[in-house]
């Protein structure tokens, strides 16, 4: 179930900062038409940090209600109790799995990381994917912590965004007997990560070019690296443009530019600069996704 290209969904907002429910449904339909294998609401790209608890639950409810593909909901927090609350709600809502970010800001030691994830896994019987993103959390989850957690029955994988293919290789090497899934957390490293045994990507770019991301991942998983490399190099300039500023600022603007929901952001995120928007437009036009 947890393989392929899965967009980390954008959460569209109205101009008065409310959740754009119809926009969210429209965005989900768009990525599904592009062939994605699942969707991931309430992650970094979904501006989960500025969603209230009720909004967080509402976004997950909408995703489950309208999705035709598996839903993996972001339910992590730097507060174990809150992460547990979000995870219980997501399980009750009918998601297929949850994504749990490593606690951020408070930077727990290895014992704290193990206790945090084990407490949630023991309390809620649902497949769980860890999320290691040091650029956001302030710490890189150690390989030995990951391999210990891989032995917990319902911790089934990790989204790895440390930027190290070597680390991914080490995780796969040390969890080879645990049926543990590694998903890329960086669009640009998806192909190399699949080449060492990764199963796919939780992707920002799949919000904009779901067909191309799905095509690249599908080809790579089948061993057709010639086709996968061709798509990888085709979309690489757009991927770079989507990270000219803090994610999801460019991704939301790109979605708006190609006719999806509004790119309105919640503070403290602000619109991208005119110069960077011009670069983004150039890449969207090159790929033919924007007229």
UniProtKB/Swiss-Prot annotation:
Family: Belongs to the DapA family.
Subcellular location: Cytoplasm
Annotated site residues (Part of a proton relay during catalysis) in this chain: 44, 105
Catalytic center residues: 131, 159
Subunit and interaction comment: Homotetramer; dimer of dimers.
Pathway: Amino-acid biosynthesis; L-lysine biosynthesis via DAP pathway; (S)-tetrahydrodipicolinate from L-aspartate: step 3/4
SMART domains, per the entry: DHDPS
EC numbers, comma separated: 4.3.3.7
GO CC entries: cytoplasm
Name the record gives this protein: 4-hydroxy-tetrahydrodipicolinate synthase
